[in-house]
A protein has these predicted regions:
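Conserved Class I SAM-dependent methyltransferase catalytic core
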Residues: 150-206, 210
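Residue-level signal for inorganic ion chemistry
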Residues: 40, 126, 155, 213
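Mobile active-site "lid"/loop adjacent to the S-adenosyl-L-methionine
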Residues: 127-154
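Class I SAM-dependent transferase core
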Residues: 5-47
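General small-molecule cofactor/ligand-binding pocket signal
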Residues: 25, 102-104, 193-196
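Conserved SAM/SAH cofactor-binding pocket of Class I
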Residues: 43-136
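Short glycine/threonine-rich catalytic loop with a Thr-x-Gly-x-Asp
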Residues: 31-33, 59, 203
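SAM/dcSAM-binding transferase cores
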Residues: 204-247
Length: 247
């Protein structure tokens, strides 16, 4: 039996992350990562010896990409859903990252009890974007995309509790929730330092924001040039090709 067959379960696929030969296990009918995860992994940065945590990690796609892009020695992927955490663990084993990346199948509000208060240098998070309302019939997808098990306020509070003074939080979120994001960050002593607005296509309204916040920092926000994903004809922009290592 090959390593691939031994790690895959029924109804699962092994997908290419298009970076450093990384692969990820996903369920055909469950939650799957999308472009926003790749954008966040490319937007954030860390030093090799930083303690790094990915919250709301899902199948650990951001954690694995960010870990490898920044050559980090030790990291943690936090995911509350058992099946997603299990898939993440098996993806980590497939990519031989088990000595550097650990999965914590836990509520993010309790993670400080495991890792310690103010013990983390860098956090990434691709949180559930949608407030509770009409959700998917698939519980796994609903929890991953809607604020059922957690919400923006709890995520920012937990991040602030985990981060050291001077530690950084990198977040991707819906652009229409930017005001709430900024409010929650500043309320929890996480100063927004860098903002990049993401447009799905030239001529279209933005749909995502990438934000860097720093714990205990002085005020002062840098707004980077817009990130446009697709040209008017629907083709990928050169920058998106570079992010996906296609150029």
């Amino acid at each position: 039996m090959t390593q691939q067959n031994s790690l895959l379960k029924d109804n699962e696929t092994l997908d290419d992350l298009e970076y450093n030969n990384l692969k990820i296990i996903q369920n055909k009918s469950g939650y799957k990562f999308s472009t926003d995860s790749v954008l966040l992994a490319n937007f954030g940065r860390a030093k090799q010896n930083d303690v790094y945590v990915d919250l709301c990690s899902g199948s650990a796609v951001i954690a694995m990409l960010f870990l490898c892009k920044n050559n980090i020695k030790k990291a943690y992927a936090v995911e509350i859903q058992e099946r997603l955490a299990d898939m993440a663990q098996r993806s980590i084993l497939f990519n031989n990252l088990q000595d550097r990346l650990s999965v914590l199948n836990d509520d993010l509000e309790k993670v400080h009890k495991t890792l310690g208060v103010e013990s983390v240098d860098v956090i990434t998070v691709n949180p559930p974007y949608n407030e509770v309302g009409e959700t998917s019939e698939n519980d796994e997808i609903a929890i991953a995309t809607h604020e059922i098990k957690t919400n923006l306020s709890k995520i920012v509070q937990s991040s602030s509790k985990l981060l050291k003074f001077g530690g950084k939080l990198f977040m991707v979120h819906r652009s229409d929730r930017l005001a709430s994001i900024m409010y929650e960050l500043k309320k929890n002593k996480l100063e927004p330092k860098v903002l990049r607005i993401v447009y799905p296509k030239k001529g279209k309204a933005p749909n995502l924001v990438l934000i860097e916040a720093k714990k205990g920092a002085k005020s002062g926000l840098i707004i980077q040039e817009p990130l446009i994903l697709n040209n008017e004809d629907g083709s990928e922009t050169d920058e998106l090709k570079i992010i996906y290592c296609r150029k």
